[in-house]
């Protein structure tokens, strides 16, 4: 990479070439869906997300973290991840909900202002995934909170997460 930067400086190129492994540019990767007018009135064309890891293997968190990189850049759509549930519109919950995280997830939901949305991300959050039936889990977010939307996949790719948001 350093050699490529040095060559760009010598040839006075303005930017590093986009990787050849990608078939499309970042703007073509994300197909935006026209938002519903009612949702625009409620959320003001922006969405604040509180991500909660409820006992997952962290694969879904990695994919959610990729949403903020330059390729997907969800902030250009008005989507922000917030550290406090008091500023959040949506809980993005991942994992099968371990017994230790059940109370924390409920407290996060209670701390959110109205209107509240819950999105379960990944197959573990839907029905427990590979942890289904374990004594240590609640077999999905829907057994703890009312879920409004589910993002399928193990883990779901960032493009799918962006489409659902």
Regions found by a protein language model. Give the residues of each.
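Iron-sulfur (Fe-S) cluster-binding modules
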Residues: 1-59, 66, 70-74, 82, ...
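Short glycine-rich anion-binding loops that position phosphate/pyrophosphate groups of nucleotides
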Residues: 55, 96-98, 124, 156
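Short acidic low-complexity segments
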Residues: 78-87
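Metallocofactor- and cofactor-centric catalytic cores in central/energy metabolism, strongly enriched
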Residues: 81, 93, 98-102
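Structural motif
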Residues: 89-90, 117
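A short, gly/pro- and small-residue-rich
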Residues: 104-119
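Glycine-rich, charge-decorated loop segments at or immediately adjacent to ligand/cofactor-binding or catalytic sites
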Residues: 126-142
